[in-house]
Amino acid sequence: MYKEPFGVKVDFETGIIEGAKKSVRRLSDMEGYFVDERAWKELVEKEDPVVYEVYAVEQEEKEGDLNFATTVLYPGKVGKEFFFTKGHFHAKLDRAEVYVALKGKGGMLLQTPEGDAKWISMEPGTVVYVPPYWAHRTVNIGDEPFIFLAIYPADAGHDYGTIAEKGFSKIVIEENGEVKVVDNPRWKK
């Protein structure tokens, strides 16, 4: 029996996919991710903002199938550090992914298991290929929601634990009105 093809609407202005599974990440869900822990705590106690929302259309976890999702990453900073997604490796490290920027201004921070990092700027129309074995995190460097579409193998899985434990070797900050990618003082090899 063949699987049934389908189509869904994606609202490029809001990032919402009709009928998708929605998940929400608040700043309080990201304890330990930002370098300035004091600024993180103050912002959580003051308002605990939504950092990002994901709208996912997922298939059965099997080789050959694809999942897709949009992420709405809101503007903001913790200290000097721009809001970002938690970031992850794939549980099956040899799986790749494709991201398409739909709205806003941001970028992707990518990293090998050894900590070699690369920054790719993203604006509407930018397509980023994430090769196998690279961790990846998106960052909103603008003043409006940064919205993108991700397409990835259904069996890729997500390894958030490695990033939660070690972090990324680089962070993205605003300094003197400029976006800078700098060494993460807390990164663990």
Swiss-Prot record:
**Species in which this protein is naturally found:** Pyrococcus furiosus (strain ATCC 43587 / DSM 3638 / JCM 8422 / Vc1)
InterPro entries in the cross-refs:
G6P_isomerase_archaea/bacteria, G6P_isomerase_prok, GPI/OXD, RmlC-like_jellyroll, RmlC_Cupin_sf
Q: What is its EC number?
A: 5.3.1.9
Q: What is the lineage of its organism?
A: Archaea, Methanobacteriati, Methanobacteriota, Thermococci, Thermococcales
Temperature-activity profile: Optimum temperature is 90-96 degrees Celsius. Highly thermostable.
Pfam families tied to this protein? GPI
Q: According to its UniProt record, in which pathway does this protein act?
A: Carbohydrate degradation; glycolysis; D-glyceraldehyde 3-phosphate and glycerone phosphate from D-glucose: step 2/4
| Name used for this protein in its record | Glucose-6-phosphate isomerase
**Which top-level group of life is the source organism from?**
Archaea
